[in-house]
Structures are given as C-alpha cells and as structure tokens.
Amino acid sequence: MQRERMSKKKISQVHCIPSGDHILMTASSSKHIPHIRFYKAWKGNNRFCCGGRLIFGPDVSSLYLTSFLIGAPALTFCIRMLVWIKRGDPFFNYTVLASGFILTLLDFTFLMLTSARDPGIIPRNKTSMILEDDSDSSLTQSMEWVNNKTPNLKIPRTKDVFVNGYTIKVKFCDTCLLYRPPRASHCSICNNCVQRFDHHCPWVGQCIARRNYPFFICFISSSTLLCIYVFVFSWINLIRQPGKLWRTMSDDIVSVILIVYTFVAVWFVGGLTIFHFYLMSTNQTTYENFRYRYDKKENPYKRGLLKNVKEVLFAKIPPSQLDLRAMVPEEDDMTIASNDSEYESEYTSSVRYDTEMGGKLIKRDSPRKLPLPTRNLDDIKDISDNYDRSTTTREDASDRDPSFFSSQLDLPK
C-alpha cells in the first residue's frame, strides 16, 4: 500500500532555462520530458527558417512580392543591356551591366539582412512574483494599476525614468509581462516587445527596430539608387540611338516601360529614404516622430547631426537576447500565450486587460493571480540614474543606448 501511494505521488521539479536576461522556470514531473528547440516553443507570431537560425515576421510572404518588384525590372534591364552589347560599344555596356548587377545584388542582400534577423525582440518575462496589497509599497506609486481587475496585485502601469534630463514614461506590457525600456514598443503584428521600435514594415515582413534598422536604411537607399540607375541608363540607351527620339521609343518599348516604372517607384522608395534620413539625422523613430508631433513634445534623444548618424548607422549592433536553438522542455507550464490564445494562459486573472491589443477583456472561469515581472524595474532605475546627470556629462551618458541595457546570459547549446 505504501509503495502504491508513493507511486501515485508526483515529485515536481523546477527547470530553469536562461533566455537573454530572463529565466524560464517550468514545473514538471520527475519523469523524463522531451526537449525541443526554443523556436518551436515560441509564443510570438514569428516564423522561422533553417532550424531557427532565421526569424521572420508573420507576413513573410510579402517578401515574394517585394523580391518580384525589385528583381523583375532589374533582370529585364540586364537582359536589355546584353542586347545593347551586341549592337556596339561593349566596354560601356558591360560596365553598365556589371554595375547594375552588383547594385541589385546589394539590394537583395540588405533586404534579407533586414527581414531575416532578430530586430531586437525583448524576451517575455517568465518569472512570477505575486505581490499582495502590503508586500511592496515602493511599487504602488501610480493611481492607474495594471491589476484593475485583480485587487490582490498592485502593479503601476507606468514608471518615470530620466533620459538626458527629460522624464520618460515606461509602460508595463501586459502581454510580455515586463516594463518596456525607453524607445521600446510592442508590435501587435509580431506580438513581441521590440527594442527601439521604429515600425512594422509589410514590404519586408519584419519589425524595423534596433538590430536591423541600419540594414533597412541601406535597403531603401540601394533601392532608390537602383531605380535612378535603371531610369538614367534606359534614357541614355534611347538617346544614343540614331533617329528621332519618339521613333526610337516606339522601337524600344522595353526601355520605355523601365523608364515609366522606375520613375513611379522612385517617388515612393525615394520619399521613404528621405524621410528616414531625416529621422536618422534627428535621432527619432517613425513611432516617436508621430507621437512627439501629436503630443508636441521635444525629442530627448537629439545629440547633434553627426552623433545622431553615428549612433544609428555606425554604432555596434548589440547581440540578440534570444537563443532560438536552445533546448527547452516540451511541456512548459509557465507559458505566455501567443496573440491568438494569450488569454488562455495558466497564469492569468479572471479578467485580463491587455494594453497593447486594444484593451480587450476576456473572462475566465477560474480566477488566478497574474505573474508580476518586477525584475527589470531595477534595470530601468539604473537607466534613470545613469541619465539623470548634469549637462556637462550628458553626452557621455547618452553614448549607451537606453533601449538595450540588460546583461546577456548564454543559453545551453
């Protein structure tokens, strides 16, 4: 009888898997649990390729359209240049052909570097710390609580930090269970909090943020140059032909189509390039540009033209906080649900409020306490201390990117 009772009991174990600067804690039975790659247990909406080595957004299929819009006219131009080579002046035409091919190759390279890499996703908080009403009075500084439906848990929805002498409010993300660092935002399409979030680009199928923004700048710049290149040399090929221009155009319809196509395209991609060069020169993101314009606030990240450009284009890209090929237990009790089922998490309140998904309320039958990720409050406080300095030392303090502040933990291979 005693052995039977012992066999019925399940001895629980805790598995701790570091993910970036977060620790995944999962409760499981003592029996062997199969492990899977971390990207297979991913709770966001991203799609993966090559065993988790490449990460895309949920709308990655738009890459086919973007590749076609770039590749089709570029290939047509190259084929047309081969025809012109046979008609004479091979050195000039070969040079134009080789330069166009290299520019197209660079454009596709920057497209993949933008779309197929981690844009700066902040790992979701997997630790839970339940606070009662009187457990920690230092966190009850706001009249607006995350737990507006959970009276036993008090979490201030916003925290004030100081960046370059300006007060910045950092918000609590109810989906990722963490306080977002300055300049970070939650992408409702990918369902992730992202460092220095600029926007979600449907043309590349990925968030544009801290770790891929320089490549995005190079991508749209090379696309603009490619449009101008094809436009100019298509005109040159028409002008170089003997006879009247209108007759030459009627005989070379392909070049005319390329001229019209690139003329229309350059207004879109060129305008986007100019806009982002303006954002880069003022050290703003697209999200901040519209927000500051609406709120009529001053940009706290301005450092001067040269320093702004250096920070955006030439600063060292921080390593990813994700190790998507790490092995994690297949059964994870402390799951944070994805966008489609985020309100079915094992750790949620009877009515959960999501600030990022439009404040949707979903009721559950059994009320549970919401896990509170307060570990990164100390990190955010460090940001406030580092940036609350005198004017003479602000430039030195602003050399570090406030959106990337946490230390990294190596995941098991």
Curated annotation (Swiss-Prot):
Query: What EC number(s) are associated with this protein in UniProt?
Result: 2.3.1.225
Here the segments flagged for biased composition (Basic and acidic residues) are 376-402
Say if the entry is tagged with keyword tRNA-binding: no
Key words of the record: Acyltransferase, Cytoplasmic vesicle, Endoplasmic reticulum, Lipoprotein, Membrane, Palmitate, Transferase, Transmembrane, Transmembrane helix
Query: Biased composition, Polar residues: where in the chain?
Result: 404-413
In what residue span(s) does the DHHC domain sit? 171-221
Q: Does the keyword Nucleus apply?
A: no
Q: In which tissues is it expressed?
A: Expressed in flowers and pollen.
Provide a Gene Ontology MF annotation, just one. Answer: protein-cysteine S-palmitoyltransferase activity
Q: Where is the active site?
A: 201 (s-palmitoyl cysteine intermediate)
Q: Which residues cross the membrane?
A: 65-85, 96-116, 216-236, 255-275
Topology in the lipid bilayer is annotated as: Multi-pass membrane protein
For this chain, the family text in UniProt reads: Belongs to the DHHC palmitoyltransferase family.
Q: What does this protein do?
A: Palmitoyl acyltransferase.
Record note on domains: The DHHC domain is required for palmitoyltransferase activity.
Protein's name according to its UniProt entry: Probable protein S-acyltransferase 3
Which species is this UniProt entry from?
Arabidopsis thaliana
